[in-house]
Amino acid sequence: MTIAVKESKILYGNFDKAKSGIMKGSGGIVEQGPGLQQRIITPAKEMPPEIPHVEFNQLPLSVLIRNLTVYAAKELSQYMKTNVRSTQDASTRKMEFLRLIIFLRNQFLRLYVLVKWCKTIRQNNFHTMIDLLNWFRGTNIIVNNCLLALKDMSTSMAGAKLPNPDLITALEVLMLGRPDLPTHGFLLTGDENGQQANKIPAKLILKRFRDLNTCLSVKISLMDLPAEMHTYSIKDGRITFTVFPEFEISLSTIDRESPLFFVDVKFLFNENKFPLNTTKIALLVNDILYKSPTPLLSLYQFLHRYVLTLQLYMIHVELQDIETNGKYSGGNLAHHYDPKKNIISLRYWLQSKMNSKCKALIGVEKTSQSIILQWHLPDTKEEGKTTKYNNLLGNIEAILDEITFNHARIIMSELLDTGLFEGDDNKNDTSDTLFFHVPVICVATAPVQLKINTISGIFYFKNPSALLLSYAKQLNQTSDLDDVVNILERLRMDKIVHILRNMFEKTGWICEDVVKLNKPILYDKHKDKKRILTRDLFIRIKDWPANWFFILNLVASGATCIVEKLIGKVQSVKGTWEVKYLDQGNLQVSKLESITYQNVMHMQKTIIQKILNHMIIDSLNELKISKVICQGEASQKLPAYVQTNTAGASNVSIIAIGLESFLQGSKALSDTLESTIFLKMDYEQNEVKLFGKFKKDTQMIRYQCDDLLINFIDKRGLAFHMTEDFTSLNHVVQYLTKFRQKLMQLVVLTDVTEKLHNNFRSEHFQIVKLRPNEISFRYLKNSKDDQDCTIQIVTNETKIEKLQVQLSPLNPQNIIQKYLECDKYDPHFIFNYLHFTSKLFSAVKSIESITNTNTMTITLHLHTLAAYQLSYHDRLTGGQIALCIDLRNSPSRAGSMYHLYFAQEDYSASKNPMYPAILQVINNVFMLNNNTKRKVPSVIRLGTGVACPLGDIEPLLEEIHSILIRS
């Protein structure tokens, strides 16, 4: 071991040249004799160096056993989990499990052997063995590194094919620093003071150079030269080819039969920026010159490709420097170098959304075999046009500046062609500024300067405001120039909206920001037109009715803006704003320049009338009511009773309303009121009136009902009006509903009173109380009650639901009340029935009041509205008589008649004590051949009964009753 160490130190030691025969090293003294033999003299008492002590990467035995146990348990558990549902057969799984057990056993066994081995060491000093093992490993690494270095040297020198003398010379240079040339008097020791040998004469050297020049001239003249290598020079035994601006290569040869070999190469574009591996180049060049049948042509092709590859790599390095430290740093430029394809893909303006069009390609052009940069022009008018740039090396940054500038100019030119911008007339063609005019007031505009940053491709405004900054951000988020134009037009529209909002808000208007429709009102009208923007501005005054707005429809195209003024109603339905009403009949169109503060203030005073008109019209539309606004010539055709009340009044609006649609087609309309009513709004008096007129004189006119708010106008009392004062604009529509309800009540009351008078044609009929929903009247003869009947008119907000007839408890017809409550009968039938049956019930009541004593009881029973039974009961004798009274239609006579007859059981009951009375009535009243004088001439005798008209029922009942009582 000691000898090996000493030899290595001698090999790499520093030699002392003080004595020619002795070399000194750090580990001993080497004596050198004439035969170059060496003998090592080792000092007698030299101690070996201490082994370095190792203290890191050591664990206690307990921790090592614990870790190994945990590892073994996890491995077994993981194996069990992963092999539960394995598709392998049982034998394969068993073998895998056995291998796992053996592996874990070996780990524990190694630990056991290590523990046993440590016990055999004296004093348990096993740390010395660990230190020794570490030293062996370090030494082994050094030796391995030397072997690897020698292997690399052998590999790199494999192509040199040097003869053995050259290898010996190389070994001499390696050991001594220079070759040992005995022929020139050089010694292996490097001693320069030795005896000098004879040198080669200079004439011989020059003669050899001349011979080589002649040989090269002859050799080159016999070889095929590529056109690029026709420029060459032969000097000092070598031929130098200059291919400008690529390379300069020197070749030489030994004789005419030997091939050319590499001497030196110089790249004319490199300027020593990159270290070149000339050794590898020499190997490749010599291989080409030796093997190729056309060596110079192959050499040029190889060097040309090598130059192109090297130049492309240098461009790649230059781009990296520009991206990192140049003006395009900060993520504005990126490139991808593909060494296999020799292509560099270049992308600029990465921060711009237009980066998909910002591309360039650097590669080798096939036709010229030179490196070019190919830039596809992003001009939509000239698709497929490209620009090529040469001489890239060292000029790539200037070329990028030119590309970005031209790209910015193209974008500016395309924007200028849209007609939305103006160029800078005061500067030359290199100006990068466009002027975009935006309004500052309705009648004036100001230019805004739009520019493009040629480094980043970002649009920006000069001296921007907050609004311009927000729109600059939008401009840089789009890649389409059409979108850029649309964004700038939206900028102009926003400025217009800002100006109008400012004007209206300063004059007391309120601009609603909450109201936002899904699409502008005029969107469908202009959606097929290009470069037309529409915007809605919803404006109102604080005291206006809710949901009603003065709407400004802005239509902008280029520098022109048209303002359409509308009145509409907008409501929120399930979170979505919808237009419920829009006045497009009175559309007012004006230019933006015509809107002034005076116009805005004037509209504030005059528009309230239109708002209320349209609010009423909208309410009428919701109710599906026909209407016409009376203005212009239509106002001159109003009826006299309407014109009289509106003559000389200002700020008055009149709306003609169809009565039938207003009252939803009531049957009483055709005979009661005129078909048209008029609604008048007086905005100065804050008064709303409804005018109407009866078609003819009716009974209703003679009655006074204060609750109906009716005021008659003319002397005949046919025209009338209803009046309400309003204090809030929101309540105007409520008054319209109130008028509708009162008018409906008026029509119903008129219809009901007419029907009552037509049905109760007697001097006893009298209306005693008249209210909008109630009519009380008397119609019975000798009635002592305040009212015999009360009619309740049941209505809802829009129509009359039903009429409820309530008979007085003292009314003898109260027995039919249950039939009147079933809602099956028409009011006309009820009134007619009450009238023609009133005498029957009055007669029965009179008979009951006179006859009902302790001995005789008379009771009226009602089977149906057309079948009655008058029962007599004698309490003394127990006799009973049932007189049936039926109301039947008479085919021979118009109208109905009463049929009176006794019940069938009364004829067969011969033991009935009152049977003689029945026979007497039959003989005197019912028999056909009875010649007695009739008390009621209109009576028709039927044998088993009798029939009489409705008006003669009272004397007939009295006659029959008198016979039955006397008997």
Curated annotation (Swiss-Prot):
Record key words, sorted: Activator, Nucleus, Transcription, Transcription regulation
GO CC entries: core mediator complex; mediator complex
Any Pfam family hit: Med14
Chief place of localization: nucleus
Subcellular location: Nucleus
Molecular function as annotated in GO: RNA polymerase II-specific DNA-binding transcription factor binding; TFIIB-class transcription factor binding; transcription coregulator activity
BP GO terms, sorted: negative regulation of transcription by RNA polymerase II; positive regulation of transcription elongation by RNA polymerase II; positive regulation of transcription initiation by RNA polymerase II; regulation of transcription by RNA polymerase II; RNA polymerase II preinitiation complex assembly
Family according to the record: Belongs to the Mediator complex subunit 14 family.
Binding partners and assembly: Component of the Mediator complex.
Function comment: Component of the Mediator complex, a coactivator involved in the regulated transcription of nearly all RNA polymerase II-dependent genes. Mediator functions as a bridge to convey information from gene-specific regulatory proteins to the basal RNA polymerase II transcription machinery. Mediator is recruited to promoters by direct interactions with regulatory proteins and serves as a scaffold for the assembly of a functional preinitiation complex with RNA polymerase II and the general transcription factors.
PANTHER family: MEDIATOR COMPLEX SUBUNIT (PTHR12809), MEDIATOR OF RNA POLYMERASE II TRANSCRIPTION SUBUNIT 14 (PTHR12809:SF2)
Protein's name according to its UniProt entry: Mediator of RNA polymerase II transcription subunit 14
Source organism phylogeny: Eukaryota, Fungi, Dikarya, Ascomycota, Saccharomycotina
